[in-house]
Amino acid sequence: MEILLAISNRKCTGVLTAKSITDIYYILRRSIHNEEEVRRLVRILFTLFEVEDTFSTDCEFALDSPIKDCENAIMVQTASRIGADCIVTRSLKDYKLSSFPVFSPEQFLTKLAEEENIEE
């Protein structure tokens, strides 16, 4: 929730992939069971986050990645291509071979707070 607040308050920019939107939609639909509410919540995500596409080149380059999970490797390639600063995930272990910066939500919030203190 704190990361959503940081994005809402424009302390950082949140980016999701189009694939992430379909995953979120699926999870919300399974837990809420109300199509209108799910669509309302997903629309809110569109107001908070930028949504980026994954290109075929992201998928191709991911095949050469040391990250064995293809979905995670594609995420790294997409993040790198769009110029993201980092990936925030609860699954740090899945990205241990990544040369791209990856943080847990807690680590990201700590980093964000440190950067705010430097700017003040």
Give the ranges of each region predicted by the language model.
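Short amphipathic alpha-helical segments and helix-helix/interface helices
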Residues: 1-4, 42, 75-76
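Short, conserved alpha-helical segments within structured domains
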Residues: 16-20, 58
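A general alpha-helix detector
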Residues: 23-27, 61
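Active-site neighborhoods of divalent-metal-dependent phosphate/nucleic-acid chemistry enzymes
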Residues: 50-92
